[in-house]
């Protein structure tokens, strides 16, 4: 269950921006980012939009941290959670671009502009890697770009190129560190809660998956997390529909009921962003096409923390 707490203004780290409602970083095309004009971090003020130097070639499916040292901003591949007094923020370099309409994305690697975060504007969970900001008007939340992986206890819940957690490849129970016997609703809730995340609600899933090619599915068991361009959403959520049925809930704030969203490869022309089993009657079921995807509240220091009905 995602925690719903308020962060005091006095907890703000040493970052100020011209506008608190957007990250300090901005994507420039597919392969470059910059620090926004008017940003002050670690005692340095960026008066103009300033390019970030990227160490080495960008790797598709990798997460990057951005540090500021001596007034110079640099991006580096983040093997772990980007942390430290000099870390300004980070981003994800996706294996394909976001949807621009309602026919999915493309297969050209790109920085996902929705994945940009900074220390004042980020997911509320501890690990911001592999997440994208989903927003509809004033409502904002962060969604895992990738389906939950079997080895999420080690790799985090959103990682490119890993075995998908499902009824045939169960993740470890956080309480015992032994694999679950079933990947049912309770197991999915527990798996994500251990990372400070929750499952998508009935109102959140169609927002996160909007932009996929509707009424379509991939041709077989995807097995690993990755790119399925026709079913990438406008926010860069990969394999967003028509790959795995994902566990979610109906949105009840007190007693949320298990639900399933998106459709799997078995659902063909029925799959899509509006595909849902609401208040699913068999939450103890576990199958090879039942997966999960994490979500987190939006944390905005100096502003607000957005939360919905995520459980």
Predicted features by range, described:
Residues 55-61, 231, 285-288:
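Extracellular/lumenal carbohydrate-interaction signature centered on repeated Trp-anchored short motifs
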Residues 1-60:
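Glycine-rich, flexible loop motifs
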Residues 98, 103-238:
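Short aromatic-cysteine micro-motif
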Residues 70-73, 147-150, 212, 250-253, ...:
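Acidic glycine-/aspartate-rich tracts in secreted/extracellular proteins
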Residues 179-183, 190, 256-311:
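Disulfide-stabilized, aromatic/cysteine-rich ligand-recognition loop
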Residues 58-74:
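Elongated alpha-helical scaffolds
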């Amino acid at each position: 269950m995602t925690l719903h707490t308020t962060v005091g203004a006095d907890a703000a780290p040493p970052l100020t921006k011209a506008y608190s409602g957007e990250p300090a970083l901005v994507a420039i095309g597919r392969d470059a980012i910059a620090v926004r004009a008017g940003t002050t971090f670690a005692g340095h003020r960026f008066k103009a939009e300033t390019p970030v130097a990227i160490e080495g070639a960008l790797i598709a499916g990798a997460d990057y941290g951005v540090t500021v040292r001596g007034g110079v901003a640099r991006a580096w591949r983040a093997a772990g959670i980007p942390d430290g007094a000099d870390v300004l923020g980070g981003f994800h370099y996706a294996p394909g671009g976001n949807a621009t309409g309602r026919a999915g994305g493309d297969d050209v690697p790109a920085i996902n502009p929705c994945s940009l975060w900074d220390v004042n504007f980020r997911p509320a969970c501890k690990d911001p890697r592999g997440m994208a900001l989903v927003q509809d008007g004033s409502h904002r939340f962060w969604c895992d770009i990738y389906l939950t992986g079997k080895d999420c206890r080690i790799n985090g819940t959103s990682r490119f190129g890993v075995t998908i957690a499902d009824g045939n490849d169960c993740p470890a129970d956080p309480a015992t560190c032994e694999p679950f016997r079933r990947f049912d609703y309770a197991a999915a809730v527990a798996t994500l809660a251990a990372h400070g995340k929750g499952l998508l609600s009935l109102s959140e899933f169609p927002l996160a998956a909007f932009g996929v090619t509707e009424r379509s599915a991939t041709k077989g068991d995807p097995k690993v997390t990755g790119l399925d361009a026709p079913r990438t959403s406008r926010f860069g959520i990969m394999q967003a529909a028509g790959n795995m049925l994902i566990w979610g809930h109906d949105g009840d704030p007190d007693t949320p009921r298990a639900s399933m969203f998106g459709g799997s490869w078995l659902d063909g022309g029925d799959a899509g962003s509006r595909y849902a089993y609401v208040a699913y009657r068999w939450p103890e079921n576990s199958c090879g096409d039942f997966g999960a995807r994490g979500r987190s509240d939006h944390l905005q220091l100096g502003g607000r923390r957005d939360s919905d009905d995520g459980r």
